[in-house]
From Swiss-Prot:
Membrane topology (UniProt): Single-pass membrane protein
Protein name, UniProt field: Cytochrome b6-f complex subunit 8
A cellular-component GO term for this protein: cytochrome b6f complex
GO biological process: cytochrome complex assembly; photosynthesis
Origin species: Parasynechococcus marenigrum (strain WH8102)
Gene name in the database record: petN
Transmembrane intervals: 2-22
Length: 33
């Protein structure tokens, strides 16, 4: 259970950081992946 929660939070933080990099590189605030 604890491992599952830890893995889910790690995956969420990783995907969030990737999204921040994509949005920051895009520069105009649109969701253009």
């Amino acid at each position: 259970m604890l491992f599952t929660v830890a893995w889910a939070s790690l995956a969420a933080m990783f995907s969030f950081s990737i999204a921040m990099v994509v949005w920051g590189r895009n520069g105009d605030g649109t969701l253009n992946f």
